[in-house]
């Protein structure tokens, strides 16, 4: 059965989703406050905030935005206003790929049929999924363009992960990884690096087969790091850890948008399926070592430091950023390259104090922009 692709556009409009921790204002623990928060939100925020698998998680999401700058303004307002309503419920918002110490066994599942289905089918695998990601949608003109962008974005997923790595701690321990989140999530079926599709028909055939064999209801149960999203007319990047600082989330959004534009507009852009085996190895290195990793470059047949690749990507993509109006935001990637990802900062704080509460306090403070729309 065809998977109809809603016609997108050639302007690379975008949308961003951020999954955030709901933490107790005094203990720093994850708390199941989503129902209370949702019940208090004013009507104009209702469509911008969503439930997730657990009651200690909420998602904020932008509408379709024409530019990265527009998305930044929306996210700033959402972080501020939703954060204020969360505070009115005795909790705080914190953004990272994992919570440093809260236990997954203590989390309450959200009452929703889809989530009930996920827990019933995946059991222990799903109960451990107390993780938080940033998703970026970029509109593309049609289905074949979606597959071209899919392959090129998948090639760059390891670099994007290294830049976003923000989950060194989990269940009260140092995992030894810069991004432990992706290691946790890859225990899901149909997760991790996606298939290397040669054309849209191959994606449709995959979806048909998985539905026919009873693995899933529809393509939204493909939880890959990158996936076409036909209902929205977009390509969706899902590999990013949630970012503590909004400016880093915005920089990664700009990088994603520019990669998609480059994949469809550059005459010398690679065509066809990406080299999935190499991408899998590079992703492992990104998860383990973040920006200290070196990735294998298939064309040059050598390992290249992640920071060098990031700098080169920014320089190569600047013309697209200028055209899209996000050059300043794209240059924010260099701040991450020089200053380190969120994992580095979390470790610096913990190594100094030995107290995970200080890490959570940093996450809360970093997540909070200038507050707007205080509850009355």
Swiss-Prot record:
- GO biological process entries: modified amino acid biosynthetic process
User: What molecular function terms (GO) are annotated for this protein?
Assistant: ATP binding; glutamate-cysteine ligase activity
Give yes or no: UniProt keyword ATP-binding: yes
Q: Which InterPro entries match?
A: GCL_type2/YbdK_subfam, GCS2, Gln_synth/guanido_kin_cat_dom, YbdK
EC number(s) in its UniProt entry? 6.3.2.2
Disulphide-bonded residues: none
What UniProt keywords apply to this chain's record, in alphabetical order? Answer: ATP-binding, Ligase, Nucleotide-binding
Question: Sorted alphabetically, which HAMAP family does this protein's record hold?
Answer: Glu_cys_ligase_2 (MF_01609)
**What name does UniProt use for this protein?**
Putative glutamate--cysteine ligase 2-1
């Amino acid at each position: 059965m065809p998977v109809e692709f809603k016609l997108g556009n050639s302007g690379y409009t975008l949308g961003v989703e951020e999954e955030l921790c709901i933490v107790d204002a005094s203990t720093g623990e994850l708390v199941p406050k989503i129902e209370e928060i949702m019940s208090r939100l004013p009507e104009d925020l209702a469509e911008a905030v969503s439930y997730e698998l657990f009651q200690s998680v909420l998602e904020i999401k932008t509408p379709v935005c024409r530019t990265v700058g527009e998305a930044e303004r929306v996210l700033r307002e959402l972080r501020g206003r939703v954060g204020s309503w969360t505070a009115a419920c005795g909790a705080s918002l914190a953004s990272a790929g994992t919570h440093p110490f809260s236990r997954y066994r203590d989390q309450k599942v959200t009452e929703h049929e889809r989530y009930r289905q996920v827990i019933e089918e995946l059991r222990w695998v799903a109960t451990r999924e107390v993780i938080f990601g940033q998703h970026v949608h970029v509109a593309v003109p049609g289905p074949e363009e979606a597959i071209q962008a899919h392959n090129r974005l998948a090639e760059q997923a390891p670099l994007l992960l290294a830049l976003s790595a923000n989950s060194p701690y989990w269940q009260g321990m140092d995992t030894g990884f810069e991004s432990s989140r992706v290691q946790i999530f890859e225990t899901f079926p149909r997760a991790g690096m996606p298939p290397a599709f040669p054309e849209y028909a191959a994606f449709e055939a995959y979806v048909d087969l998985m539905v026919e064999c009873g693995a899933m209801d529809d393509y939204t149960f493909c939880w890959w790091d990158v996936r076409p999203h036909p209902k929205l007319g977009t390509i969706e990047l899902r590999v990013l850890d949630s970012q503590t600082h909004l400016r880093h989330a915005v920089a990664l959004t700009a990088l994603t948008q520019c990669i998609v534009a480059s994949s469809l507009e550059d005459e010398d852009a690679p065509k066809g399926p990406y080299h999935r085996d190499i991408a899998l190895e590079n992703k492992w290195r990104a998860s383990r070592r973040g920006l200290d990793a070196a990735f294998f470059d298939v064309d040059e047949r050598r390992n290249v430091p992640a920071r060098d690749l990031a700098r080169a990507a920014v320089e190569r993509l600047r013309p697209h950023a200028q055209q899209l109006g996000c050059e300043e935001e794209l240059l924010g990637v260099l701040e991450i390259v020089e200053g380190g990802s969120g994992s580095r900062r979390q470790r610096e704080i913990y190594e100094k104090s030995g107290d995970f509460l200080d890490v959570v306090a940093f996450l809360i403070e970093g997540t909070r922009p200038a507050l707007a729309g205080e509850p009355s």
